[in-house]
Amino acid sequence: MSMEDPFFVVKGEVQKAVNTAQGLFQRWTELLQGPSAATREEIDWTTNELRNNLRSIEWDLEDLDETISIVEANPRKFNLDATELSIRKAFITSTRQIVRDMKDQMSASSVQALAERKNRQALLGDSSSQSWNAGVADRYGRLDRELQLANSHFIEEQQAQQQLIVEQQDEQLELVSGSIGVLKNMSQRIGGELEEQAVMLDDFSHELESTQSRLDNVMKKLAKVSHMTSDRRQWCAIAILFAVLVVVLILFLVL
């Protein structure tokens, strides 16, 4: 959650580069179609800067394509659904179309002819370059102000988007923290109940041992009483037999 998605970092750089390229393209169009004369240096500089920006944007878009391919190969690892992938693909497609449109207009035959004519006019007008310097400085200053304004708007949008992402992450962290608290309370209750049951089992074990000891004592006493009773019965039987023997002897003597 705390790690920033690299796609949004590259996306921000691409959007910033597109804004710069659009400003250069507008200036390049004004130089070719405007009624005022422009020097060859200004036309060449604007053209080269525009082409370099477009080439850099294309490279960044290729990097974004590679990141999407990696995510599509293992979507579970990056936790991105199909909707988010579609949004990212749409951004790449639309940006690539913007770059393609500007390149097509720059490479059009009519535009090339206009650029060559402007270059010839610039070469013919180099003798009056001193009177043009003030106008060039003003145009460059206006272009810089426009670029700075576009960049400031872009930075504000990115900051607002990052703030929204941070707020969403904070909300998710609060939900996770609440769930952890509930689980902690449940685990504490379960632990208390287990401890109570352990105490009850320990008491029951002691009672069982005491009962077993008392039962053993009773069994020993019963065995002792049984042994004593058996001895008494034997003496009684001997006495009866002796009495019978005496009676028989008396009868024998009498008869």
UniProtKB/Swiss-Prot annotation:
Membrane topology: Single-pass type IV membrane protein
Domain t-SNARE coiled-coil homology: 163-225
Transmembrane spans: 235-255
A GO cellular component entry from the record: cytosol
Coarse class of the protein's main subcellular location: Golgi
Residues annotated with N-acetylserine modification: 2
Keywords from the UniProt entry: Acetylation, Coiled coil, Endosome, Golgi apparatus, Membrane, Phosphoprotein, Protein transport, Transmembrane, Transmembrane helix, Transport
Compartment annotation: Golgi apparatus membrane; Golgi apparatus, trans-Golgi network membrane; Recycling endosome membrane
Keyword field contains DNA-binding: no
GO molecular function, one term: SNAP receptor activity
GO terms, biological process: endocytic recycling; endosome organization; Golgi vesicle transport; intracellular protein transport; regulation of protein localization; retrograde transport, endosome to Golgi; vesicle fusion
Membrane topology, Cytoplasmic segments: 2-234
Alphabetized Pfam families for the sequence: SNARE, STX6_10_61_N
Modified positions (Phosphoserine) in chain numbering: 2, 129, 152
Region feature (Required for interaction with VPS51): 2-168
Coiled coil residues, start to end: 41-74
Self-association and partners: Identified in a complex containing STX6, STX12 and VAMP4. This complex also includes VTI1A. Binds EEA1. Interacts with VPS45A and GOPC. Interacts with MARCHF2; the interaction promotes MARCHF2-mediated ubiquitination and degradation of CFTR. Interacts with MARCHF3. Interacts with BLTP3B (via C-terminal coiled-coil domain). Interacts with BAIAP3; this interaction is increased in the presence of calcium. Interacts with VPS13B.
Family listed: Belongs to the syntaxin family.
Protein purpose: SNARE promoting movement of transport vesicles to target membranes. Targets endosomes to the trans-Golgi network, and may therefore function in retrograde trafficking. Together with SNARE STX12, promotes movement of vesicles from endosomes to the cell membrane, and may therefore function in the endocytic recycling pathway.
Protein name: Syntaxin-6
Lineage of the organism: Eukaryota, Metazoa, Chordata, Craniata, Vertebrata
